[in-house]
């Protein structure tokens, strides 16, 4: 509550609006995307806490729709921004405080993000761990979807805020993907929401950090690199959605009613914990 409700409310009116993220001033943190992103991430954190610590919510099939909906909204926000940047027809100008390069990579990556949304499944199988952490675990969200998401998200940051790609892209993604693979399998979305919300709060409070000579990691803004990264993102998500659709039809699993990946070892590794307590 302190980190994801009280502090953001105080920062909104004492720092962000009047000083560091004022809309319409040309600041990189003053765009619609940054404001929507920080609050959608915070809403995700609060919603996940309600599911984790309220038994009625964690067992309510309608409440379990919240995680895929807020995840889809977050992805869609970035897709819209990618398409918007394409429409700017930028060729290296500073727009909204960052260097912009528009091109087909924006369209490719926007499509990749939409495919990533379509491959989300199995939210009805979300459950809360019985240990003291009470983690929100999603067995059907497997490693290959997470990798496809990471590639897409890095491509988005590289396309739309290139000079922030090291921190907001690579470092931020690794911070939740490594735990999901090696520490707490199944809890990726919970970790993603927390790390994203904290990063957005930090960057809106100290926007100069990523552009400072000491800490900044500037991008090359090379059109070939932009194209290559978005091409890989699109290819990865085409592969994931193709496999997803194949499984749906082969095993006759309606993704709106049941989990799709119940035969996967990675699914079983997470679901086994639920079965131990059922």
Where do the model's predicted regions map?
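Generic multipass alpha-helical transmembrane bundles of integral membrane proteins
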Residues: 59-187
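Membrane-interface segments at the starts/ends of alpha-helical transmembrane spans
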Residues: 24-31, 91-106, 215-229
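C-terminal transmembrane-bundle signature of multipass membrane proteins
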Residues: 168-277
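Juxtamembrane "helix-exit" motif on the non-cytosolic side of transmembrane helices
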Residues: 14-24, 79-87, 152-162, 208-217
């Amino acid at each position: 509550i302190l980190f994801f409700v009280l502090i953001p409310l105080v920062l909104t009116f004492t720092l962000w609006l009047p000083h560091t993220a004022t809309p319409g001033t040309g600041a990189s943190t003053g765009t619609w995307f940054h404001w929507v992103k920080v609050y959608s991430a915070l809403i995700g954190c609060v919603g996940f806490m309600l599911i984790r610590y309220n038994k009625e919510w964690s067992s309510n099939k309608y409440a379990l729709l919240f995680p895929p909906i807020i995840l889809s909204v977050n992805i869609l926000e970035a897709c819209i921004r990618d398409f918007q940047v394409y429409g700017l027809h930028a060729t290296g100008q500073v727009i909204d405080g960052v260097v912009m390069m528009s091109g087909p990579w924006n369209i490719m990556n926007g499509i990749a993000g939409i495919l990533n949304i379509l491959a989300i499944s199995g939210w009805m199988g979300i459950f809360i761990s019985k240990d003291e952490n009470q983690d929100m675990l999603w067995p059907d969200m497997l490693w290959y979807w997470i990798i496809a998401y990471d590639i897409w998200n890095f491509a988005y940051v590289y396309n739309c805020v290139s000079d922030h790609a090291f921190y907001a892209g690579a470092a931020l993604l690794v911070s939740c993907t490594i735990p999901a693979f090696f520490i707490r399998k199944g809890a990726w979305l919970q970790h993603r929401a927390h790390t994203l919300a904290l990063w957005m709060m930090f960057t809106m409070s100290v926007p100069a950090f990523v552009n400072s000579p000491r800490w900044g990691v500037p991008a090359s803004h090379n059109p070939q690199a932009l194209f290559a990264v978005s091409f890989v993102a699109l290819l990865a998500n085409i592969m994931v959605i193709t496999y997803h659709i194949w499984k749906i039809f082969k095993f006759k699993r309606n993704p709106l009613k049941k989990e799709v990946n119940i035969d996967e070892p990675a699914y079983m590794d997470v679901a086994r914990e639920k079965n131990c307590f059922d």
